[in-house]
Structures are given as C-alpha cells and as structure tokens.
Amino acid sequence: MHHSAKDNYVHLTTTPVPRLITSLAVPTIISMLVTSFYNMADTYFVGKINTQSTAAVGIVFSVMSIIQAVGFFFGHGSGNYISRKLGAQETESAEKMASTGFFFALFIGAALAVLGLLFLTPLSLALGSTPTILPYTERYLGIILLGTPFMTASLVLNNQIRFQGNAAYAMVGIVSGAVINVVLAPILIFVCDMGISGAALATVVSQICSFILLLYMGRRGGNIRIRYRNFTPTLAFIKEIIGGGTPSLTRQGLASVATILLNVAAGAYGDAAIAGMSIVTRISMFINAFLIGFGQGFQPVCGFNYGAGLYARVRQGFWFCVKVGFFFLLVCAVAGMGYAEEIVSIFRKGDPAVVATGAAALRWQFITYPLGAWIVVSNMMLQTIRKPVRATILSSARQGLFFIPLIFILPYFLGLKGVEMCQAASDMLTFFLAIPLTCGVLAEMKRKEAEQLQQRQS
C-alpha cells in the first residue's frame, strides 16, 4: 500500500499497465462480488419466507438503485475530478472536492429518506406492488429508507478512496459491511422471527457499519481527509460534479426506472414472474460485479494518466480491460446456458413458475453477455476522461434509450417471452451504439500522442 499522494502519483503513472490495473482491480472486484453476494443472500434468505417476499425485495431494489444513483453521482463526479487533479498534482482542489461531494451526498440522502417515509404507500404501489405484495414491500422499504444517508455517503467515500488509487482501503469498508449483513440477516429473519423486516434491518445495520469503517479508512494511506471546513459548494465544483457524475446518475436512475417497468410488465403474468425476473437481476449483478470491478480498477489509472497527458497508457488500459472482460463473460455465458434452471432454483426451488421464468430470462441474458465488456469499459473511460455527452448517451442507452421502448413493444407482441428477452435485445443495440462513441475518443487520444511526439522531436 502507498502512504502519500506523491507515492500514488508515481505508482499510477509508471507501473506497467496490466499489472497496475490488476492490482487495483482485485480489491475492487472482491468488494463488488461480496456486495453482490450479500444481495443474493438477501434474496436467498427472503426466498425461504414466500414468493411475495422475494418479489417485494425485487421491487424495493429499484428504490435502492435510486439511492445508489445519488451516491454514484457525487462519488464519481467528485472522484473523477480528484483523480485528474492528483494526476496534475493539484492537491488543494482535490481536497476541497472530496469534502464537497461527501457532504452533498449526506444531506441529499437524508432528504430522500424523509420524502420516502412520508409517501411510503403511494411509492410502494408506484413501484409495481400488487395487492398481495404491498404489505411486504411497505415493511421492507420503510426500514431500508432509514439507511439512505449512510448508503449515499458510503458510496462517495468508497469511490473517492478508489479514485485515489487505494482500492484496498475501500474494500475493507465495503466487505466488512457485506459480511455483517450476511451474518445478521438469517439471525434476524429466522432466529428473531422478524421475517422480511429482519432482512431490511440487517441491510441498514451493515450500511452504518460500512459508513463508519470507510470514514476511518479515508484517514489512512495518504487518502484525502474529509473536513467540513473544506466543504466548498461553489458553482465551479457543482459543474464538475454534474459533468463527472451525470453519466452515473443517468445509468443508475434509468436502471431504477427499468426495474420498475420490468416489474410492472412481469406483474401482468403474476407474482411468480416478478420473483423470477428479480432473481435474474441479482444473478446478473453478481456476474457483472467482476467486470465492473475490473473496470473500476482501470478508472484511477485512466484518470491519473489522462490528467498527466500519458494517453498511450490510457488506451493500453482500455484494451486490456475489454479483452479480459470479454473472455470472462464468454466463459460465464457458455457455462450458464446449460444450468439456468439449477441456478435459479437455488433461490426459489419450490415454485416451478418462478424457475421457468427465471431460467428463460437468464438464457436470453447469456446470449449477449460478452458484449457487456465493451459497453461497460467504454462508459467508464468516457466518464473518467470528462467526455460527459458521450458518456451520458452511452449510460442512458442500455436501460433507457433502448430498454424503455422495448419493454413496451416486446411484451405486446411476444407476451412473457418479450419480458424475458428485453434486456438482451437492449444490450445488443447498446453495443452497436458504443462502437462509434468510443472509437472516436480512442482515435483522438492517438492524435494527441502523435502531436506530443512531434513536439518532443522538434
């Protein structure tokens, strides 16, 4: 681990790119996998209660996506800026941005919690709850909302630490919270007989623990410390957060809208269809955690080296991540196609309708899985190097621009099969859009390299 900002700068701009990305990606991948695992563990434990509880967790997931969107907005918006400024060795600006992003997220998270609790029943219905699912949704959501400010602030701390090149410190905070959740959830659900309320309480307690640990970790390893006196809500900083964070807000916000629309579309075919699609969402998140974690290992490398004008290292890192991600997702897709029923059955074995819907949707997902490597890594690069328009277009495509029309069109013509195949169809269209958006930027960096070489020679 590195113990000063200067050490981090030298490390991130001189270490061979594949080794550097791998070293940064491993703790991030562990964080992502453990977080996804505890999401799946929640689904597994709640699935032991009944189908309605499983569906309720899937419905509330869309609200958690909105909360995450706020956290990622401020975390990525401030983190991208911090990595570029540290790459340019402008530490004071980076320190002010760190505190500004953190306190904005904390205040807005608290406001969201209050609003959600005031309108709990209308919100639960709007998210797609059927009359039989509504009581479970209200119980689960009412507790989850209490953890909102801790969740948004934790995501900011996690991303800021990671963008400074100290992913291992970020991992400790995230993994510790996830482990607490996995241990606490079955105790509260079954031993204390709290049911779905126990699952929600375990999640909130784990979020508070992560928040405290990340605050502590943020004071170690040469990381920028959060101080209220550095809170600088100036127009310049707000514009930087908007520019760097809008792609994340768009991506996560549309993911939430997509989940709501998916639940509403699936709800036409019964509670089992909602539960089946909810399980597939959690499985996909777990597999994608590797790719996202690997891409997040690339982001500090991308930000520091782009800020330092080392464009060849940015391009090298991009292609390395795309290749590794493609082959990993290809292996997962091939292996998963033959065992879709068995995978879904882990979460809801006693309900054949849930298994049938989930297995069909999972197979459709696997068909386009390898294309996700290009989409995800492209989006992360565009966002980190401050290409907000391209990054926002790409981030809005997968679960907005393409998914939203498809979730209305495909079920109309194909029924339940249209619901099951919707995400795969959207992924295919997003891949074709991502090619020109990314290739233009890669070519631009290559031109800048040539100009630098020409200047050195002259």
Give the ranges of each region predicted by the language model:
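Transmembrane helical elements of multi-pass membrane transporters/channels
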Residues: 23-42, 143, 177, 206-210, ...
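Transmembrane alpha-helix boundary and packing residues in multipass membrane permease domains
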Residues: 28, 32, 44, 61, ...
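Short alpha-helical transmembrane segments in multi-pass integral membrane proteins
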Residues: 1-25, 82-149, 191-246, 302-368, ...
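Small-residue-rich hydrophobic transmembrane alpha-helices
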Residues: 54-114, 151-170, 276-340, 372-394
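Helix-terminus/linker motif at the lipid-water interface of multi-pass membrane proteins
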Residues: 33, 37-55, 124-131, 187-194, ...
